[in-house]
Amino acid sequence: MNTTSAVLLLVGLFAVIFTLSVPIGIYMSAVFDGTLSQKFPWMYRVESIFLWPLGKSGREPMDWKEYCVSLIALTVVGTVIGYLIFRFQGYLPYNPLNFKGLAPDLAFNTAVSFSTSTTWQGYDCENVMSLFSQAFGVCTLTFLSSSTGVVAAFAFARGLIQSRDPSLGNAWEDMVRCVLWLFLPLAVICSIIAVWQGCTQTFDAMTVVKTIEGPIQKIAVGPVASQEVIRVLAVTGGGFFSANSAHPFAAPTAVVCMIQIILMLLMAASLVFAYGRMTGNVKSGFSILFGMMVLFIGAFMLIAWSESTANPLVTELGVSHGLGNMEGKEVRFGTLLTSLFATGSSASAAGSSAGSFDSMMPIGGGVSLWLIQVGDVIFGGSRSGLYTMLGLAIVAVFILGMLVGKTPRYLGKRIDAYDMKMVCVSLLMPSICTLIGTAIACLTPQGVDAVSAPGPHGFTQILFAFSSVSNFNGSSFGGLAANDFFYNTALAICMWICRMVTLTALLAIAGNMASKPRQMNSVQAIQTDGPVFSFMFIMVAVLLSMITFFPAQSLGPIVESIQLFWGYHS
């Protein structure tokens, strides 16, 4: 690995992210606290057009139960509409290739995937999805489901700043503001840049070209740029093509690839800054952001080092390994940029890919898997990233309080037993679904038959799939043939349970916090804006994930690495 190139790449990446996250964070806080709508009355009137069908309930404050029910109801409606679109796409317009409707189990899995913002894709995207399904099914659900995660994060922040006021805002108002004033403007701007760089944006289904050898080739096209931008901006990852960002029409240049990496991390950084402004403690937000950055850099260096290492089985064949492990990677990106993309995708729960996770070296694949298993925490973005991070922050404050004998308070709110129970529920549910789902798959013929390689690599394929859907990531080891009734059903159940349980538990914490008095500057308070808190935040994230998943990782990537470097070359 070229260390200088890696360091310069990281410095440039974070310089751009921090430069952009401050103004975007200020803008986001103005959007969600209503300042922008008050300053520009026309924006309020536009919002009212979309909220008109709801009447007064579109503006009235909600407690946590009403807020939660509204978001769950939207998710249910999105799932039903998505299922109908995917199931009956053969009868809908914009289907020039006459694709039939998806099978019931696949349509169910896909609808749940995009309505919960997981965007797991167990199908060959451009070869089974009509343009209508891509543009009006996949893309629309991406906007709505991602907005659900953002508004839930701001509802959590309101719970921390309210004092004896159970209101968390209005879910419908927040959703409209998120889509209209946050995602749509950014998506339009970035889509124009993507088209300029070579991404396709058309309602033609394919383009016919004559190859150098002479035969005619049909290449799938469509409204790619608009979908590719929102999937990375909203940190969902559901691509137009099966190859995702490795496809030359999705990321035609290294510039587009780098922009996609920036967008994956930008929303998370902006959310943290906006959270700090809303709570009146920007330093606390930066403490969390610093912890996220440390974990990200460490993971990237491990993955980049692993992928710069030659595969010993390939070296034995006399193949030059000067470029590192190039299997499953695009030459236009190389190992370094692909490693950075994989780190950003796994850490931010974007689920995108610019190369094959299945072809990574065991350490690289294992670190990517661990980033997913940490739980949408490191630059978690618009899915459940911010409110999951705040859940970990509450755990860190609680542990610090126990260590020093102080009352655990976070931003002036006392942390009680109810808060800790709900945090435990939200943090443990994805782990439970991951491990139980993996165990069931390994014990059933349907689960085992889907793997492409026996032994530890096949186990990693299964573990990666259930880790991905339970933590709202959506990426996968491509060698797992997951488009069957068993995996479509099992993975959809995991996605649904984890989304509903974590969302409900963390909004319950927000409601409980909102009803408490806020006592700032208490002598019993623990500082949450310094290096000690950042260190504890990092330790909690690392230790919780390692304690939970190290045994499973030992059976997969760790054993595979030992076999690869020592087992065959002892």
Where are these regions (language model features)?
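Membrane-proximal intracellular helices of multi-pass ion channels
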Residues: 2-570
